[in-house]
């Protein structure tokens, strides 16, 4: 199997196994699907702590308003009585005004948080360090875990406007958000290797040959952004090792310089001409009047 180290810019994303015979069209779709699904898991995991601490999301027309403004405008959250967490709610006001403040109890909070950590671990970049390749099945498992935890805590479900439910049902609207800049659709996705675009319509072996044991770095980006920056000749870890070696060498030279004692150069035994003068009888000669 060919192992691909997928990056976005200079940031590592995940490892992916494929074959040299794969069509670039298929490969792009597979990598793009995993890349975007991992982003979805991250977005849900970002909202889970808010759900655990402050309950369900308020309707859009009530978000950001003070209690007085809500009363004055005669607004009411119709989902508050429908979406009650298992075991009852504990009130904790959301200072931002996005959620209604009726949070789950500690036991249910623990279910949400524990599941969130398990889901994050499945698609974590630490998998790359452990040389574990990510598959779409792994990402789907993470999404299923999150969906299951939400159903346990909220048996009646979440409001249709809650960002977690919208993400789970693929109804999210990321327009105008920072998250939208990270998403890459299959139509606009490009794969690059060694500053070469991997063109759809060709196979991977057209670029890297037929060796199935190849390991390469592939970069994913949006069409029209030009060639991504080349990979540095020396990796970040190798650079750190070189700097450490250089520093240690400098310290060793400094210690040798400090320990360098040349007073012995005045000694008789260090005189290269002493033996010659001894054979010629020129030792112990005193100059000047006696």
Curated annotation (Swiss-Prot):
GO terms for biological process: cerebrospinal fluid circulation; cilium assembly; determination of left/right symmetry; motile cilium assembly; pronephros development; pronephros morphogenesis; regulation of cilium movement. It is found in: Cytoplasm; Cytoplasm, Cytoskeleton, Cilium basal body. Disruption phenotype: Larval lethal. Animals show strong ciliopathy phenotypes, including pronephric cysts, axis curvature, left-right asymmetry defects and hydrocephalus. Kidney tubules are dilated and polarity of cilia in the epithelium is disorganized. Cilia length and number appear normal, but outer dynein arms are missing and cilia are paralyzed. Morpholino knockdown of the protein results in similar phenotypes. Strongly expressed in ciliated tissues of the embryonic trunk, including the pronephric ducts and spinal canal. Keywords: Cell projection, Cilium, Cytoplasm, Cytoskeleton. Signal peptide: none annotated. It comes from the Eukaryota. Changing residue 44 to N: In tm304; temperature sensitive allele with strongest phenotypes at 32 degrees Celsius and milder phenotypes at 25 degrees Celsius. Body curvature defects and kidney cysts are seen in larval stages. The keyword Oxidoreductase does not apply. One of its GO terms (cellular component) is cytoplasm. InterPro entries: CFAP298. Plays a role in motile cilium function, possibly by acting on outer dynein arm assembly. Seems to be important for initiation rather than maintenance of cilium motility. Required for correct positioning of cilia at the apical cell surface, suggesting an additional role in the planar cell polarity (PCP) pathway. May suppress canonical Wnt signaling activity. Interacts with dnaaf1/swt. Interacts with lrrc6/sea. Interacts with dvl (via DEP and PDZ domains). Belongs to the CFAP298 family. This is Cilia- and flagella-associated protein 298. It comes from Danio rerio. The lineage of its organism: Eukaryota, Metazoa, Chordata, Craniata, Vertebrata.
